[in-house]
Amino acid sequence: MSKNILIILFVLIPFNSFAEDKKTTFNEKLFKNAQLEGKVVVVSSWIKYCSSCASQMKVLNKANKEFDNLEYFAFDVTNEEISNLFKVEYQSTILIFKDNKEVYRSIGETNKKEIYKAINKFI
């Protein structure tokens, strides 16, 4: 019995700590300011315990550091106000904005090469 409990804890603890790394960084004022500054803006949605969301966030956080003219925001898809603003229904959605317009939308893409290819189209 105690062996089963240890196994369950061993499995669940990493997922719980992994989920804590995700946070909403979206702020409408910062989003608008980044667009006014002429930046390419990337927004992604996530939900707790979504492994593809975590993979996307890892790639997008790295891209945010590598591309000078890029601003990246993330939000919890259960936040209805933000989800409705962008008409996002699913977690792991990536949106790219250029010149105040949505120019790209993807659901579930986690491949770094494909994500960077999409970003490079608009940088």
Predicted regions and their residues:
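Short active-site neighborhood of thiol/selenol oxidoreductases, capturing the structured segment around
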Residues: 35-48
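Typically the conserved alpha-helix immediately C-terminal to a functionally engaged Cys/Sec
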Residues: 52-66
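Sec-dependent N-terminal signal peptides
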Residues: 4-13
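Extracytoplasmic/secreted envelope proteins and their assembly/folding machinery
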Residues: 28, 57-61, 116-119
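Structural micro-motif
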Residues: 86-95
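Non-catalytic, surface beta->alpha helical segment in thiol-disulfide oxidoreductase systems
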Residues: 98-123
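N-terminal leader/targeting and pre-domain segments
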Residues: 18-37, 120-121
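Thiol-based oxidoreductase modules, predominantly thioredoxin-like and allied folds used
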Residues: 45, 68-81
